Amino acid sequence: MYMDPISDLLLRIKTGTKTKRNSVVVKTSKLVTNILEILKNEGYIEGFKTESIGKNKNQTVVNLKYRNNVSSITGLKQISKPGLRIYSEAQKLPKVLNGLGIAIISTSMGLMTDKNAKKNNVGGEVIAYVW
């Protein structure tokens, strides 16, 4: 059975924050690494590290971020799914919680936040909302 790497990543992070874990382990891919880089730059996670677990197999350990025992990530929602892709133009990119959250957008220039996509005037596939 095929498991979408984006939904797997978001589900593991969501479960980890609900159970107050310090870190979660996810499968490694370029897409997952790019999403984690955005979450790190926006201050939603402390960091991540890729580890080798065998021949041609890697896993990524994501260090979750907490402030006063409250998770930095209040919510995660996958928007575009393998069965239903959601695209948006640069002018119509969604605002998450009136700008308090971010939307992760896959553009022709790579993955970026909704703010960066508007600044660069590029649209693309809306991957997920994070707040």
Swiss-Prot record:
Entry keyword annotation includes rRNA-binding: yes
NCBIfam families per the UniProt record, alphabetical: PRK00136.1
Identification of the protein by name: Small ribosomal subunit protein uS8
HAMAP family: Ribosomal_uS8_B
Subunit composition and interactions: Part of the 30S ribosomal subunit. Contacts proteins S5 and S12.
Gene3D superfamilies xrefs: 3.30.1370.30, 3.30.1490.10
Keyword Ribosomal protein set for record: yes
Domain of life of the native organism: Bacteria
PROSITE patterns to which the protein is assigned, alphabetical: RIBOSOMAL_S8
Native source organism of the sequence: Malacoplasma penetrans (strain HF-2)
UniProt GO molecular function: rRNA binding; structural constituent of ribosome
Cellular component GO terms, alphabetical: ribonucleoprotein complex; ribosome
Cystine pairs: none
UniProt similarity note: Belongs to the universal ribosomal protein uS8 family.
GO BP annotations listed: translation
Cited function: One of the primary rRNA binding proteins, it binds directly to 16S rRNA central domain where it helps coordinate assembly of the platform of the 30S subunit.
Keywords, in A-Z order: Ribonucleoprotein, Ribosomal protein, RNA-binding, rRNA-binding
Cross-referenced InterPro entries: Ribosomal_uS8 (IPR000630), Ribosomal_uS8_CS (IPR047863), Ribosomal_uS8_sf (IPR035987)
